[in-house]
Curated annotation (Swiss-Prot):
HAMAP family associated with the record: Ribosomal_uS7_A
Organism of provenance: Methanosarcina mazei (strain ATCC BAA-159 / DSM 3647 / Goe1 / Go1 / JCM 11833 / OCM 88)
Its job: One of the primary rRNA binding proteins, it binds directly to 16S rRNA where it nucleates assembly of the head domain of the 30S subunit. Is located at the subunit interface close to the decoding center.
Gene Ontology CC: one annotated term: small ribosomal subunit
PANTHER family registered for this protein in UniProt: RIBOSOMAL PROTEIN S7
Protein name as it appears in the record: Small ribosomal subunit protein uS7
MF term (GO), any: rRNA binding
GO biological process: translation
Gene: rps7
Amino acid sequence: MIFLYKIFGKWDPTEVEVRDLGIKRYVSLAPVIVPHSSGKHARQQFNKSEISIVERLANNLMRTETNTGKKQVTLRAVEEAFDIINRKTQQNPIQILVDAIANAGPREEVVRLKYGGISVPKAVDTAPQRRVDTALRYISMGTNAAAFKSKRSVAECLATELIGAANRDTKSFSINRKDAKERVAKAAR
């Protein structure tokens, strides 16, 4: 009998399919019970893609000054959000997370080039690693903004944000930010 670890002891990451081939290499679905690696991948530049995607989401949620360092609280909120997602959609919440990341990551961005003292915006394709990082940042920013001075818990706000991003709902903060960034890039072509 082969025993595979499930994330939080409930959800099997081996059932999850990354449909966006561009980010497949950068979304780690390694089976772990508790997504907490203690930062062992922080020494090398691109090793963050080896960390479980659930842990990277939790790390991004700890960005605000009130949540800094409270990883157990954040992991509990992520687990509760996954329970809410499972109740609402009847799907594996890790699949919803992966779909949300694929939908919320901008494909095109703007860089500023200097030509003789004049800065000119130019549209460029976004690297897959940066797409994943930006999508996680937008999802966590949307969650924190929705939960700030609200009666709703962080878990409820995270579940709403992930479901909205997975369904490409424009009311979702992350999809809205992605569309705005791509709109600026389209104008700079």
